[in-house]
Amino acid sequence: MEEFDSKDISTSKDEDCVPLGGECHEDDINELVKEDEVDGEEETQKTKGTKRKAESILARKRKQGRLSLDQEEEEDASRESGGRIIEKEDAAAEQEKGAESEDARQEEADVLASSVSDAEPKSELPPSTQTKTGEETEETSSSNLVKVEELEKPKKAEEVKLTKSPLAGEEVRFLTQQGRLSGRTSEDEPRRSEGVQHATGEERRADTNTSSKNEAAGQKWKGQSAVDVSGDESKLRCCKEEYCIGTWNVRSMNPGKLDVVKQEMERINIDILGISELKWTGMGELNSDDHYIYYCGQQSLRRNGVALIVNKRVRNAIIGCNLKNDRMISVRFQGKPFNLTVIQVYAPTPYAEEGEVYRFYEDLQHLLEITPKIDVLFIIGDWNAKVGSQEIPGITGRFGLGMQNEAGRRLIEFCHHNRLVITNTLFQQPSRRLYTWTSPDGRYRDQIDYIICRQRWRSSVQSAKTRPGADCGSDHKLLIAKFRLKLKIIPKTTRPFRVTNEEDATNEEAKSVLKQNEKEKPEANVPSTVSSVPGGSGMTKEVGETSQEAKSVFKQDEKDKPQANVPSSVPSLPAGSGPEKCDLEKKKDCNN
């Protein structure tokens, strides 16, 4: 046998310390010992973790009543031995996963090792001692990977429970946290109201789900409105009210027809009504019961004429009016947040001269230019034009009637130039609520009356249609539209009369005289009922005075000239003869 030599033992130990044939130092040995201690601590923590898992699984199974006595003993044994069974299962699963993704982990380990080496201070050991075997490299990379994953992994949101507790007769919501790590329960946690601390993502989701359930059940918290609206949006909603605007061609307006029109306004709740073919002389304004009328016509002829009638609801919101001519008139109302301007027009017929049509659109364009761009604008009336059923984006809709004519083409060009939209072609309605004119024999129907507004205020119009039930003895139908806006009610106040110069004084005096005359004789320009003239087949006479004065004048003329109505073919007879007296009496009876 060979002799035992102690030098061989020391040499073998040194060789074990130096894997690459280098010298072995005490620092290297201490480093290896520290690594062994760290590995031991990790194994101890793993053992404790497996024990906790085993205890939790056993408690869960006991609670569910699924374990027998033998199974409980086996679980106790495995728990006492440090959860070796679970460790073996976990190790096998990890080994399988590691075999499948070894290459991927190696790449990730290299990247993470480089990042860790940059962040941590470098070791003072020589390169020879820092070199490790393949197994140690895998363990180090896996441990680094776990550490980085733990650092990068976001903290799990704390579980939240929504509870309610009565306080002073009201239901107050409190959010409590279940702190598993700190060991505190919801009872130990101090109450906090909403808004004291920032809620987590799960808190917000829980609150959203609770609010949606309350909305579905029709419940709401005390002191909260049914609709949660921001400040600006709530102001915008509360400043809008629904108003009704309309236009009607009445084919001349007498006192009896005016009463019918006012009754229809009250029945349908029309706030602003435009009138075409008024056929009144002069211009001005007058009160009629609860309605106020602005009108404009020719000076001497009872032809054309337009008017705007407003009810008492919007009377005090009027800022002023512009009596342009016998074909157009405008009235401006004060509103929130924008003012309202309404223009009533009566366009020339298709058989009118080209110069008259040109002057009409020129005057209307001038009236639009002096109207503020920010105002809510409506142009209503009888346009005597057919725009057709073809849709023109931004100008007409799909619900027009008939074929487009030359007057309709001119109207579309005017709307395109001024960015206007024809509202009563935008809404789908039955045909009887689309046409605005009917021929006397009832065979033809057309859409020639329109309510036009600016494109930017198109959404404020809620509906537009005709009312066939309204009748005032005209071949046109009443056309109305409902829109949403807030009109400001201005209280009536007496303002002092102030004059800056002589020219202003003259203008103010003229205006005061005109208003005084209109107040004294408001019905002077309204035509009375029509009387027939004998001997003029089909001829009519429009009387400006009262009917009693007209009758007295007519009788006086008959007494002065009794022979004027006797036919020339009757031969003259002696005075006092029977046939002459009989013929005159018959003629008087016929005239009466």
UniProtKB/Swiss-Prot annotation:
Residues 499-578 are annotated as: Hydrophilic. GO terms for molecular function: catalytic activity. Phosphorylated by CK2 (casein kinase II) in vitro. It is found in: Cytoplasm; Nucleus. InterPro entries: Endo/exonu/phosph_ase_sf (IPR036691), Endo/exonuclease/phosphatase (IPR005135), Swc5/CFDP1/2 (IPR027124). Gene duplication of the ancestral BCNT gene leads to the h-type BCNT (CFDP1) gene and the p97BCNT (CFDP2) gene. The latter contains a region derived from the endonuclease domain of a retrotransposable element RTE-1. This repetitive sequence associated with the BCNT gene is specific to Ruminantia. Its main location: cytoplasm. Pfam families: Exo_endo_phos (PF03372). Residues 1-225, 499-592 are annotated as: Disordered. Expressed in liver and lung with higher expression in brain. It comes from the Eukaryota. This is Craniofacial development protein 2. The keyword Cytoplasm applies. One of its GO terms (cellular component) is cytoplasm. Residues 25-42 have a biased composition (Acidic residues). Keywords: Cytoplasm, Nucleus. SUPFAM superfamilies: DNase I-like (SSF56219). The keyword Transcription does not apply. Residues 175-184 have a biased composition (Polar residues). Residues 1-16, 78-108, 147-162, 185-207, 508-523, 552-562, 580-592 have a biased composition (Basic and acidic residues).
